[in-house]
């Protein structure tokens, strides 16, 4: 089993070497194993499987992260819920068939892993760290119980030293997902990573380092580091801690050594000065590393590295939010944790792809709705430049679902908040904590007390960041002073309350913690084109003219107006960045709908038209000119077919078959006319539409064309990656488009496509973004939706080349090579 010395983040490794049983990284006195491969898995209840002698040879062999339910099949009876959704304006309960995705995640299952940790010898300490397990994990080592947790979204650690053996060890983990425990698809299984950390008895515990930057200016930054030490059991007269801070180039920029004498509290506190600090921001995500070395009796006992950033955040009444002294508004999205066709199983390449899409849109912030994020997401946000609102709960004591967090709150809430903060408080991307989302406790007598209880825990564990919560019962929250207690009052879907709330609240600021909830299906256009609330159609789709929304929500433009007009509103987090499994509003009762319509980007990762509306608003540095809709509407000849342009240019002219339809300019007449250019009365005729954009001086600066498509002729493949790492985990996403003989997208094509991967890669999953599709993600075939779908391929551990071929009856086969190295 090989070992390498590497850099760590948050006291944990960010580079892991695959070995026979697991990955391993080793520093002086510390070795970490990633238990990734050769797990045995079975659904059902097998309490006898805790025994090392248990025969699991007939169980499925899996690698983790693993989501046991994502392969389906879809069924409207899976976790169907007879509930009344108050936010939807419902007066009575009704059967919701796709609320949690229609996947078979309810039930019990077991995982087993037999591993060897060569670094574990007599006198060593062993800790098991689980980043997340869905849900109610109970952990057994070598036949004996060692610990448990309840909340499936949280990270937790267990000291397994007393049950660990030199040589072979058997780890068994039981999990159980209850019915009616969620409002969206939660995933199932060991969907995040599992680590075994071996140290000396004298060591620094998991999350034992806490880094803050209390003083920052252009000349220097003061970096304060508090480091805990595990209690001593040896005859050491003194401990000393050496900390070295290095920049991204590996250059030492500060260092300090401190001695801890016998009788002192087991915590070091150090102050280091970094000259001319390079500050962290979404635009410049500069990072530093604090290398920690712990000595006892002159002997090096522990060594690891914590990545952090230097940045200042302020939230000021009347002025709003500033980062590094620059006032700005959050251009954020809310995201659930599933990765579309991959389910809840975490994958760094999939997360990075999501973030790259959001970055191109101009997004600079993410709300981890409605739970703790995977550490990989937080790390990527540090590196790529996204601010994070890290959220904890969807329920407090008042329930929303039958078996939700309300049953856990009294026993687990403080433990869960503490773990959430300790796991994420060194990350510069994290700029606020959220303690809840739309909790019914807003309206109860006890709600304010619960809020203060949770907020006080956050302040105690991390006084450097404010606390918010997403409120939807605004009148109640204002009348009973619930909203007054929060550091940052978060409003969900209430832009028209901002003015009154600002007058009544003491904070002097408001956050749009959840906004818009516009619904649309990529490539679908409905007529007539008018704003509509909870509009439903026979095909279970929603229009991409982006004027349809929910009972509680608005179109994007309404929120834009308030964000632009009110200085004290500090930004927004749109619901949602990506479509997700579950919550198919407005079709909650209309199977086969089983995934959301809210996303700016669909479940396959293809941007909807709305992406370009947000891009035109949020990313002014990059030109945006996008035409809505496509121009292939057989049977609509002579009928009114509005054309929209989403652009950051002030005006544009529309041409249909080279005939001008007039120039439109943005105006403040309505919310939509401020942010969209609209030709509402044009009539459809086949051919070509062209939009020419003009700058502020009236000069033509950009144009875009859309042509009427002919019959499907061939397939075009486009990959987001040209080269993959040969690590057995890296992913490429290939968009397959059905086009006519001239290369125009066939926007209604539903051809069934088949996929084959040869060479040094494997087929992983496919998705088409259709919320009604019951085709299974893991099978190598699927119908195109509105002419497109996305195939995901995975590298092997052997370098070379993989080849993807996509075929369909009557169409020319397309082949795409991708290098792996």
Q: Which residues make up each language-model segment?
A:
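Extended acidic/polar, glycine-enriched regions
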Residues: 165-166, 226-316, 679, 685-686, ...
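Extended carbohydrate-recognition surfaces in non-catalytic/accessory domains of CAZymes
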Residues: 28-129, 187-190, 578, 635-637
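Bacterial Sec-dependent N-terminal signal peptides
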Residues: 1-30
């Amino acid at each position: 089993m090989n070992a390498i010395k590497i850099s760590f983040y948050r006291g944990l490794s960010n580079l892991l070497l695959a070995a026979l049983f697991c990955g391993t990284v080793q520093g002086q006195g510390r070795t970490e194993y990633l238990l990734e491969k050769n797990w045995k898995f079975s659904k059902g209840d097998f309490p006898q499987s805790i025994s090392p002698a248990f025969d699991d040879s007939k169980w499925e062999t899996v690698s983790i992260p693993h989501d046991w339910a994502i392969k389906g099949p879809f069924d409207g009876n899976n976790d169907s819920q007879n509930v009344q959704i108050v936010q939807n304006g419902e007066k009575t309960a009704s059967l919701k068939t796709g609320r949690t995705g229609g996947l078979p995640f309810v039930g019990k299952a077991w995982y087993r892993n037999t591993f060897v940790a060569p670094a574990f010898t007599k006198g060593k300490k062993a800790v098991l760290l689980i980043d997340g397990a869905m849900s109610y994990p109970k952990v057994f080592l070598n036949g004996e119980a060692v610990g448990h947790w309840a909340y499936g979204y949280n990270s937790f650690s267990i000291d397994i030293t007393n049950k660990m053996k030199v040589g072979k060890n058997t780890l068994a983990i039981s999990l159980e997902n209850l019915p009616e425990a969620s409002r969206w698809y939660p995933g199932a299984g060991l969907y995040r990573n599992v680590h075994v950390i071996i140290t000396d008895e004298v060591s620094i515990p998991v999350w034992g380092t806490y880094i803050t930057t209390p003083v920052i200016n252009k000349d220097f930054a003061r970096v304060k580091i508090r480091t805990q030490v595990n209690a001593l059991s040896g005859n050491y007269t003194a401990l000393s801690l050496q900390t070295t801070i290095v920049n991204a180039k590996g250059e030492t920029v500060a260092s300090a050594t401190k001695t801890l004498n016998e009788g002192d509290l087991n915590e070091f506190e150090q102050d280091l000065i970094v000259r001319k600090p390079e500050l962290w921001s979404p635009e410049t995500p500069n990072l530093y590393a604090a290398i920690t070395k712990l000595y006892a009796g002159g002997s090096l006992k522990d060594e690891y590295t914590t990545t952090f950033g230097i940045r200042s955040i302020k939230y000021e009444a009347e002025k709003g939010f500033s980062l590094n002294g620059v006032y700005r508004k959050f251009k954020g999205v809310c995201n659930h944790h599933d990765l579309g066709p991959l389910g809840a199983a975490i994958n760094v390449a999939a997360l990075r792809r999501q973030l790259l899409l959001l970055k191109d849109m101009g997004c600079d912030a993410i709300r981890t709705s409605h739970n703790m994020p995977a550490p990989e997401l937080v790390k990527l946000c540090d590196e790529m430049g996204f601010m994070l609102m890290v959220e904890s709960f969807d329920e407090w004591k008042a329930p929303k679902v039958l078996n939700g967090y309300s049953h856990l709150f009294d026993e687990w809430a403080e433990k869960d908040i503490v773990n959430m903060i300790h796991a994420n408080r060194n990350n510069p991307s994290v700029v606020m904590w959220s303690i809840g989302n739309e909790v019914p406790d807003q309206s109860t007598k006890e709600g304010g007390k619960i809020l203060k209880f949770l907020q006080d825990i956050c302040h105690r564990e991390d006084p450097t960041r404010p606390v918010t919560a997403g409120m939807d019962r605004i009148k109640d929250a204002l009348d009973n002073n619930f909203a007054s207690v929060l550091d940052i009052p978060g409003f969900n879907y209430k832009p028209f309350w901002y003015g009154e709330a600002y007058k009544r609240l003491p904070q002097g600021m408001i956050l749009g913690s959840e906004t818009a909830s516009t619904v649309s299906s990529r490539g679908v256009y409905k007529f007539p084109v008018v704003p509509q609330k909870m509009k439903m159609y026979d095909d279970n789709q929603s229009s991409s003219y982006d004027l349809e929304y929910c009972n509680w929500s608005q179109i994007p433009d309404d929120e834009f107006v308030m964000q632009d007009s009110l200085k004290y509103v500090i930004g927004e987090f749109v619901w949602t960045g990506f479509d997700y499994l579950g919550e198919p509003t407005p079709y909650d009762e209309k199977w086969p709908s089983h995934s959301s319509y809210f996303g700016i980007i669909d479940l396959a990762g293809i941007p909807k038209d709305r992406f370009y509306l947000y891009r035109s608003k949020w990313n002014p540095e990059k030109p945006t000119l996008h035409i809505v809709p496509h121009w292939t509407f057989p049977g609509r000849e002579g009928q009114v077919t509005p054309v929209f342009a989403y652009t950051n240019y002030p005006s544009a002219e529309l041409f249909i078959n080279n005939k001008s339809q007039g120039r439109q300019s943005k105006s403040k007449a309505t919310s939509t006319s401020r942010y969209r250019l609209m030709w509402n009365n044009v009539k459809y005729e086949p051919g070509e539409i062209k939009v020419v954009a003009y700058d502020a001086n009236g000069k033509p600066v950009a144009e875009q064309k859309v042509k009427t498509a002919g019959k499907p002729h061939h397939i075009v493949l486009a990959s987001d990656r040209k080269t993959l790492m040969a690590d057995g985990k890296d992913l490429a996403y290939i968009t397959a488009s059905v086009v006519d003989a001239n290369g125009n997208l066939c926007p209604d094509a539903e051809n069934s496509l088949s996929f084959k991967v040869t060479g040094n890669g494997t087929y992983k999953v496919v998705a088409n973004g259709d919320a009604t599709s019951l085709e299974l993600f893991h099978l190598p075939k699927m119908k195109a939706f509105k002419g497109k779908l996305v195939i995901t391929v995975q590298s092997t551990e052997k370098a070379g080349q993989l080849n993807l071929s996509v075929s369909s009856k009557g169409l020319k086969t397309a082949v795409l090579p991708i290098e792996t190295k």
